[in-house]
Amino acid sequence: MLAKGLPPRSVLVKGCQTFLSAPKERLGHLRVPTSEGAGISTRSPRPFNEIPSPGDNGWLNLYHFWRETGTHKVHLHHVQNFQKYDPIYREKLGNVESVYVIDPEDVALLFKSEGPNPERFLIPPWVAYHQYYQRPIGVLLKKSAAWKKDRVALNQEVMAPETTKNFLPLLDAVSRDFVSVLHRRIKKAGSGNFSGDISDDLFRFAFESITNVIFGERQGMLEEVVNPEGQRFIDAIYQMFHTSVHMLNLPPDLFRLFRTKTWKDHVAPRDVIFSKADMYTENFHWELRQKGNVHHDYRGILYRLLGDSKMSFEDIKANVTEMLAGGVDTTSMTLQWHLYEMARNLKVQDMLRAEVLAARRQAQGDMATILQLVPLLKASIKETLRLHPISVTLQRYLVNDLVLRGYMIPAKTLVQVAIYALGREPTFFFDPENFDPTRWLSKDKNITYFRNLGFGWGVRQCLGRRIAELEMTIFLINMLENFRVEIQHLSDVGTTFNLILMPEKPISFTFWPFNQEATQE
């Protein structure tokens, strides 16, 4: 169930913008060879103002953007602009000016120049909320030394291989419970299969997974009767994303000062997220002080952070809140897209299942070993993120002047990598509309160089990357072992932007039980 008054997550919401003549999601070849300007040139760089642009009037540009494309199709706006301007352009929307790039060679130059404390674009309504209500912030919104201090401490508990191996049994338990949910539905249906939209189930699965990893405790989101407090948190996360979109290109303080419905609708879920996350964290802390460490097994990320003393309790709470809020819609959306692509490409699904079953037999059921034996499955997650990235761009503010495509880009300029457009550009991916995980297994580095960008790059890549990769891989292992996934309509469902990229309309899957014994006879 969604919060009252909210549109479904997978339905396009046009808001107050008029959506006219949306371009198709297929990208044509760039007109200029990508080797020109990507490397070092002996010519003097051209000035910033000569970079191709629709014009310097940000408010007029914003008006045309709203009228001709619409906020919820910003990914296609990038596609159109690259078709018009080729590998680089600059655009001012409202009061935010950016340079956009698509070529992996330019992406490499950008990220290799980012410095030790990279800064990215901060979502304006999120910053405004934290500043006005004086909420503590974590690594998502921190900068410079404060960001570095928290990130180093968190990396040890969230990214380090010796730590992430502890996540395996926690994530596997949740995945097996999800499989049980589908088996019960198949049995209840009485038709030998189950058909339906499982997007809400995937959100609950993702919330159950991230809370189990952080707190070492289950929240009951996959039970017959769903935990209502957990569901309220999930709904608040979606509403937070949804209500952010309309304030991306206009000063959020305008919405706040005039007490608009848009601002109120954004504040309400943020308050829920903070209150619930604080409650989870403080209850865990209180129980730990009361009971002490009576367990010798791994008890989750929060337990380790509390015992480390490298971060204050307020900083821990802020970062736990961000991990909870960032670990639901993002992971669940990628899993939905992955199931969608597998259902449309049954030969690929059969290849993935064969790899998983062989890995299970060879590893004799040990999940850590299984994970080492499924390179194609891991490549399929990369392929899903190529076609369906969660973010529409990756952003960096330049530390120093940088020459890209023969143009001098001044320090402090916001440069954005349009990863949706990049993933579908035939100049950089052969047959880009085809779901082909094997492309990522090539030993030719030119095929994959700075193209796997679903989680970002460098020291400021997604903090939850290792959790998400393990969570998705283990989920898919369990699903492939138990079900054959099909879809009735093979046509493209389309993509819409609600701060993250998601299906434009609900996807209905059909799950058939998979008989492993029959395949071994």
UniProtKB/Swiss-Prot annotation:
It holds the Pfam family p450. Its cofactor is heme. Pathway: Lipid metabolism; C21-steroid hormone metabolism; Steroid metabolism; cholesterol metabolism. Its EC number is 1.14.15.6. Keywords: Cholesterol metabolism, Heme, Iron, Lipid metabolism, Membrane, Metal-binding, Mitochondrion, Mitochondrion inner membrane, Monooxygenase, Oxidoreductase, Steroid metabolism, Steroidogenesis, Sterol metabolism, Transit peptide. GO terms for molecular function: cholesterol monooxygenase (side-chain-cleaving) activity; heme binding; iron ion binding. Belongs to the cytochrome P450 family. Signal peptide: none annotated. The keyword Metal-binding applies. It catalyses: 6 reduced [adrenodoxin] + cholesterol + 3 O2 + 6 H(+) = 4-methylpentanal + pregnenolone + 6 oxidized [adrenodoxin] + 4 H2O; 2 reduced [adrenodoxin] + cholesterol + O2 + 2 H(+) = (22R)-hydroxycholesterol + 2 oxidized [adrenodoxin] + H2O; (22R)-hydroxycholesterol + 2 reduced [adrenodoxin] + O2 + 2 H(+) = (20R,22R)-20,22-dihydroxycholesterol + 2 oxidized [adrenodoxin] + H2O; (20R,22R)-20,22-dihydroxycholesterol + 2 reduced [adrenodoxin] + O2 + 2 H(+) = 4-methylpentanal + pregnenolone + 2 oxidized [adrenodoxin] + 2 H2O. GO terms for cellular component: mitochondrial inner membrane. Heme binds at residue 462. This is Cholesterol side-chain cleavage enzyme, mitochondrial. Residues 1-39 form a transit peptide. Its main location: mitochondrion. It is a peripheral membrane protein. A cytochrome P450 monooxygenase that catalyzes the side-chain hydroxylation and cleavage of cholesterol to pregnenolone, the precursor of most steroid hormones. Catalyzes three sequential oxidation reactions of cholesterol, namely the hydroxylation at C22 followed with the hydroxylation at C20 to yield 20R,22R-hydroxycholesterol that is further cleaved between C20 and C22 to yield the C21-steroid pregnenolone and 4-methylpentanal. Mechanistically, uses molecular oxygen inserting one oxygen atom into a substrate and reducing the second into a water molecule. One of its GO terms (biological process) is glucocorticoid biosynthetic process.
